[in-house]
């Protein structure tokens, strides 16, 4: 039998080479750098709060390991801040970057390192979303939140002692981001059937598995428990791997994420990304004809928001976000199709008890 090879089917997948999850693993950052042959000048990208939580420790540990460490403090995930990080990296002749934070700093390090063609290490201080290990970065450009393609971290060092000490709201938001995989994969399957879009069964299965684990363990995810932090971090890393395998954010981002991004634009005070995605998943699962009650119950058990009131967002903004969600990424086909009308948007929000 003759084997025919399609040369155009090759795909480049970037995955983290070292992933450390556990109590006190931050102390091993020097060993990770040696293992990955990373030496010379490191640039630590962090915020003022996360610098006190872990940034200064990372700097001291790197210097003890024979690396010099410079630091740049950031405040927002904007295009201008990416340029600021890049300028600092060039100024100090950086060999690699380290993002230390709950999301913003990691995304900035991710984008800056990608553009500079330098490796970067992800050191999350909270487990609030799957950006800690993915090849995607959320950035604000001209006042609009966008998802940009970048490189995956060469290593992830997730110290559960630090992560479990963060406000539990962040961990609960991370659970919402993971559970949203369910509707993301359903949207992906729909696009494959109706628009002949590429569908990766392996990436989809990995994504679904992460969501299923969180739902089945919802009762045991508690504040200040390192076992809870470890469980959520591993699922978030799985999300990042699934996206890298797929070559897009499809396994972990669908209509529920478009709803969240619409809320970011519309609501005066948006909630956390993962919180909004969790609520969006309840409604999008209803539209898919799936078990939205299971999603809602799991989020409630964890302590994540399931209503507009719990998000701190007025009902009218929920409806408006539902009406505009399909236009956030018009090239990405989802259950929202060409959009909901006002009556349908209100109906889904009321039936799923997101609004009263």
From Swiss-Prot:
Q: Where in the cell is it found?
A: Cytoplasm
Q: Where does Zn(2+) bind?
A: 177, 257, 273
Q: In which pathway does it act?
A: Membrane lipid metabolism; glycerophospholipid metabolism
Identify one Gene Ontology CC term for this UniProt entry. cytoplasm
| UniProt KW keywords | Cytoplasm, Lipid biosynthesis, Lipid metabolism, Metal-binding, NAD, NADP, Oxidoreductase, Phospholipid biosynthesis, Phospholipid metabolism, Zinc
Q: Does the keyword Cytoplasm apply?
A: yes
Binding positions for substrate per the UniProt entry: 130, 177, 261
Give me the comment on cofactor binding: Binds 1 zinc ion per subunit.
Which transformation does this protein catalyse, written as a reaction?
sn-glycerol 1-phosphate + NAD(+) = dihydroxyacetone phosphate + NADH + H(+); sn-glycerol 1-phosphate + NADP(+) = dihydroxyacetone phosphate + NADPH + H(+)
Please indicate if the UniProt record lists Ligase as a keyword: no
| NCBIfam families with a match to the protein in the record | PRK00843.1
- Give the similarity note: Belongs to the glycerol-1-phosphate dehydrogenase family.
Q: What is this protein called?
A: Glycerol-1-phosphate dehydrogenase [NAD(P)+]
* Phylogenetic lineage: Archaea, Methanobacteriati, Methanobacteriota, Stenosarchaea group, Methanomicrobia
Q: Which gene encodes it?
A: egsA
């Amino acid at each position: 039998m003759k084997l025919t090879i399609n040369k155009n089917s090759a795909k480049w997948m970037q995955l983290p080479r070292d992933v450390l999850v556990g109590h006190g693993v931050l102390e091993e950052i020097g060993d990770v750098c040696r293992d990955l042959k990373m030496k010379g000048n490191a640039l630590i990208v962090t915020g003022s709060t996360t610098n006190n939580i872990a940034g200064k420790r990372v700097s001291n540990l790197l210097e003890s390991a024979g690396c010099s460490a410079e630091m740049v403090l950031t405040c927002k995930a904007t295009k201008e801040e990416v340029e600021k990080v890049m300028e600092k990296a060039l100024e100090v002749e950086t060999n690699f970057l380290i993002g230390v934070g709950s999301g913003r700093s990691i995304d900035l390090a991710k984008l800056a390192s990608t553009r500079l063609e330098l490796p970067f290490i992800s050191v999350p201080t909270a487990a609030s979303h799957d950006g800690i290990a993915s090849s995607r970065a959320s950035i604000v450009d001209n006042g609009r939140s966008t998802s940009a393609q970048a490189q995956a971290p060469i290593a992830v060092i997730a110290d559960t002692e630090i992560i479990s000490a963060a406000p539990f709201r962040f961990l609960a938001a991370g659970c919402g981001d993971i559970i949203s995989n369910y509707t993301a994969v359903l949207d992906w399957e729909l696009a494959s059937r109706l628009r002949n879009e590429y569908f990766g069964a392996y990436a989809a299965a990995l994504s679904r598995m992460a969501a299923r684990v969180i739902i089945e363990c919802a009762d045991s995810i508690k504040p200040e428990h390192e076992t809870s932090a470890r469980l959520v971090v591993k699922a978030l890393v799985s999300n990042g791997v699934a996206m890298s395998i797929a070559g897009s954010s499809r396994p972990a981002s669908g209509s529920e994420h478009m709803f969240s991004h619409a809320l970011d634009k519309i609501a005066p005070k948006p909630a956390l990304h993962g919180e909004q995605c969790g609520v969006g998943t309840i409604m999008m699962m209803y539209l898919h004809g799936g078990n939205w009650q299971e999603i809602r119950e799991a989020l409630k058990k964890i302590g994540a928001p399931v209503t507009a009131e719990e998000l701190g967002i007025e009902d009218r903004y929920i409806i408006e976000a539902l009406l505009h969600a399909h236009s956030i990424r018009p090239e990405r086909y989802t259950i929202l199709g060409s959009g909901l009308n006002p009556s349908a948007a209100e109906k889904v929000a009321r039936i799923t008890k997101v609004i009263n």
